[in-house]
C-alpha cells in the first residue's frame, strides 16, 4: 500500500483523547467538556497550518516546506502514475493547487477544469484520483423529499489542512489566519475532526450539508438513529444568528419520511461550552 494513504491523525488522537464519534448530544458535549483539555485558541491556526501528518507532529524539527515538497513530489511521481495514467505531471500539480482553493467550498467542476485547461470530465476523474489517494473527500448534499430547493453539488475538503496550506503557498500560521482563506480552512479543520472521529471508530461518517437556492446553508448534518443533528461552523466568538438557519430544516420532521431534529450548535471560537437555547450550544472548536 502507498504511504500516501496513511490516515492523517485527528487532534484528539494527538492529545490521546478517548476515541468516540462526534454526535453533538448535550450529554456528550457536557461530558467531553469536563474530561478534556481544550485546544487553546492561540494554537488553533498553528495546528491548522501545521496539518495532521504524523511525521510532522512527532518531529518538530522536521521542516514543513521540505516535508510537503517531498510528499507532493512522491505523490506526483508514484501514486498519480499508478492511479491516473497522467502524462503531464506539471498539469496535474496545477490541478492539485487549484483544487486546494476549493477546500470547504461547493465544487464547480467546470470552473475548476477551466482554471487548469482540462475538460470537466477530466477534472472529475482527477478528483476521484485525489479521493482514492485519501487527499480529499466529498461532503454530499443532504437530500429529503420535503426539502425541495436543495443544491445538488458536493463540497470538497482536503483531509490535511497543512497540505492545502502548502499548495496555496501560505508560508505561516499567522498569514493563513489573517488571509482570505481563513474561514475555509477553519471549516475544513472542523469538518475533518468530526469526519475522522467516525473513521477512527470504524464507522462510515454519516455527514452531509444542506444549502438551498437562497444560499442559506447548514454546514454539517450528522444523521444517526433517525435523528439529524445540525451544526453551523463560524470563525467568530459568538455567532448569534447562526442557529436561526436551522429553521430551514423544519420540513424534514413532517410526513412519511420524518426525521427528528436533534440538538446541535455552532462550532466557533467561543472559549466555553455555552447554551444558545434549549437545544443548541456554542461549541468551542477546541472541544472537537
Predicted regions and their residues:
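A cross-kingdom feature that marks ATP-driven nucleic-acid transaction machinery
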Residues: 128-129, 134-136, 140-288
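Generic structural marker for isolated residues within well-ordered, non-membrane alpha-helices
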Residues: 11, 109, 191
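Interdomain motor-coupling "hinge/lid" segment immediately C-terminal to the ATP-binding subdomain
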Residues: 2-3, 7-101, 105
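Short amphipathic alpha-helical interaction segments
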Residues: 118-132
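Conserved phosphate/pyrophosphate-binding and hydrolysis machinery centered on Walker-type P-loop NTPases
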Residues: 34, 58-66, 85-89, 102, ...
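A short alpha-helical element within helix-turn-helix/winged-helix DNA-binding domains
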Residues: 106, 111-116
Amino acid at each position: 500500500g502507498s504511504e500516501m494513504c496513511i490516515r492523517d491523525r485527528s487532534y484528539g488522537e494527538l492529545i490521546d483523547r478517548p476515541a468516540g464519534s462526534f454526535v453533538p448530544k448535550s450529554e456528550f458535549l457536557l461530558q467531553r467538556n469536563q474530561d478534556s483539555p481544550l485546544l487553546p485558541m492561540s494554537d488553533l491556526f498553528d495546528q491548522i497550518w501545521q496539518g495532521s501528518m504524523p511525521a510532522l507532529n512527532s518531529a518538530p524539527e522536521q521542516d514543513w516546506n521540505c516535508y510537503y515538497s517531498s510528499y507532493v513530489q512522491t505523490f506526483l511521481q508514484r501514486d498519480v502514475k499508478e492511479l491516473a495514467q497522467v502524462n503531464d505531471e506539471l498539469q496535474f500539480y496545477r490541478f492539485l493547487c487549484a483544487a486546494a482553493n476549493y477546500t470547504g467550498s461547493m465544487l464547480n467542476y467546470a470552473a475548476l477544469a477551466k482554471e487548469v485547461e482540462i475538460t470537466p470530465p477530466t477534472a472529475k476523474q482527477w478528483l476521484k484520483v485525489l479521493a482514492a489517494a485519501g487527499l480529499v473527500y466529498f461532503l454530499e448534499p443532504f437530500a429529503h423529499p420535503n426539502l425541495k430547493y436543495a443544491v445538488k453539488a458536493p463540497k470538497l475538503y482536503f483531509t490535511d489542512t497543512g497540505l492545502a496550506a502548502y499548495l496555496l503557498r501560505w508560508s505561516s500560521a499567522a498569514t493563513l489566519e489573517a488571509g482570505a482563506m481563513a474561514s475555509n480552512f477553519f471549516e475544513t479543520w472542523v469538518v475533518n475532526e468530526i469526519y475522522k472521529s467516525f473513521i477512527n471508530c470504524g464507522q462510515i461518517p454519516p455527514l452531509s450539508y444542506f444549502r438551498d437556492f437562497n444560499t442559506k446553508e447548514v454546514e454539517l448534518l450528522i444523521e444517526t438513529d433517525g435523528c439529524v443533528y445540525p451544526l453551523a461552523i463560524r470563525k467568530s466568538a459568538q455567532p448569534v444568528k447562526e442557529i436561526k438557519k436551522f429553521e430551514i430544516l423544519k420540513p424534514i420532521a413532517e410526513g412519511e419520511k420524518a426525521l427528528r431534529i436533534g440538538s446541535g450548535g455552532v462550532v466557533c471560537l467561543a472559549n466555553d461550552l455555552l447554551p444558545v437555547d434549549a437545544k443548541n450550544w456554542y461549541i468551542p472548536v477546541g472541544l472537537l
